[in-house]
Amino acid sequence: MVAISEFGLKIKNIEASTLFEYNIGVRDHYEYKDAMFTNSLFKDFLEENGLETYKGESTRDIICLEFHYGSRSYQQELEHLYKVATTAQKEYNKARIKNDKFLLEKAKNKQNKIKELLLFARKNRLKYQQLTKEQLRTKFYNEGVEVEYITRKRNGEIKKRETIRYKMLFRSTGKAKKGSCMFIRDELYEKAKDFLYMGIQLPEENAPLVEVSAYAPLVASGIVGRVKIDPKNILILKDVDRYFKTNIVSIETDENKQCIAKFIEDYELKNTLFDGQALIDTSIFPEWGNGYILLRHHFCKMAAFHANIQMFFKDYFGDKYETATVTDMFGNEHYVKDIELITTDNAVKWLKMDVSYDAWCEKVYENNCMFGIVKTAHESKLGNVQKMSYQMVNSLDIDIMEDVIKESALYVERLKTDDECFFDYLKKHSNFSNDHEVLLALCEHNPEFVRSSYFRARRSDIIKAYTLKMKSGELIQIADNLTVVGSPYAMLLYAATGKEESVDEDDTFFFEEGTIQCYTERFNSDEYLAFFRSPFNSKNNLTYLHNMYSKKMEKYFKFGKNIVAVNMIGTPFQDRNNGLVYGSV
């Protein structure tokens, strides 16, 4: 078992409605679960600035609140308890009919507890306050909240009471989806807020609250590692847009407000070539990284792909390499020999907050230039194959279904006839609720067990269950989940010159009628590939790719088998894939 402290600090995740009712005296406890304050640059900062921990494993200085329910009025509490009492009476009657002493005792205890709760509710009827979950959220956000911690002796006697007051700190995008929010101890609030906001002072009126709420928590993203990058060695360029014309089907509404599909010829589309991506030099790319790393810092997020930046610059500039310079979007000159990372303005959100380049660099220097690594690419647990979804299957023509199901049909046949294949399936799909590990252990203990009637019956049942899943759309294909990078060689050319027109000199990809050229080591050169966006919304997200190897791609990029580079110049790749974001940033 891996200790939780390896991934962060244990904190309390409290249901806000129960905490409110506890604080006003109408509950004897509040509901909570264990959660984790994950490793992050923000956690590093707090630990250096007064965060108190217990044995380096947990902290009370940070809590998470969830707002799933509102608080009850006295009448609502009575109705709830009467409903529970009715259910408890039914359980008691069933236990009495069965004459089960254990169930009878359990039912009696439940009824006695409900009686205690009814007496408690009547005694405190004037204390109840009915608030919706939205009202509770507003109250806690504006006023903060107190949490009482009780330490008990082994016999249950109260040893110590401690009350800590918290203020609302932030909601990350992930937390916002769940309706939860991070709160911090009062004494740490100002330091923590100043760190998250980079010291940005918001105006009293028309403050960009939505933007700040989205970008400030980036530095609090959970990380799996760190990489040191001098901000002055980061080349930030203005992103490049490329326009082209193609035929499209536009979904519109007519005068009767009915949805119609309208065919339009020579419609102008736009590709933002490097949106949210970066190239990182091999000299600082971590050894454990695989093709790319997802980076976070103050108001900054980017997918940084493994490249031989300095090798390219040496080849490009030749004898002038030592003195060659390029100018960034702020007018700063950089020696190309010093550049460790290349990105664009779309990756640095501090520009939207009117923060200067120098001010951001100073903030990066404050934590010794350490960038957080959120994730990297990794191999699929299914190996050489991947499962399709029913949406993917439904997007394909029925005429080709025989080819679509071919791999799955062959696999089912192998499960029936190949013991090693079946054992491998058991290993990959074993969990605490099935008997796969037991079957494997019995076969290992006695190989002849595979001939037993019990094993044959279980094998048949397991394969039948798998075929049912297969029929629901989970067909397997020789495929993989790949991370997308857009026209990376064009990005190198742009970095060498600082001129937008240089991207058009990219000769690693060319326009090809009916398909889009790409480069990935996962498949062979000159193979044609079906690209399904994830999540896959409709057949419009299906793209036909042509895998093309080139010496330049092999020389200047170390992507491995989990990255696919796609031609973004003059192709509808972004629009066909709903404005797909590179590297899942």
What spans do the regions from the language model cover?
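Core mixed alpha/beta domains of very large multi-subunit molecular machines
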Residues: 1-584
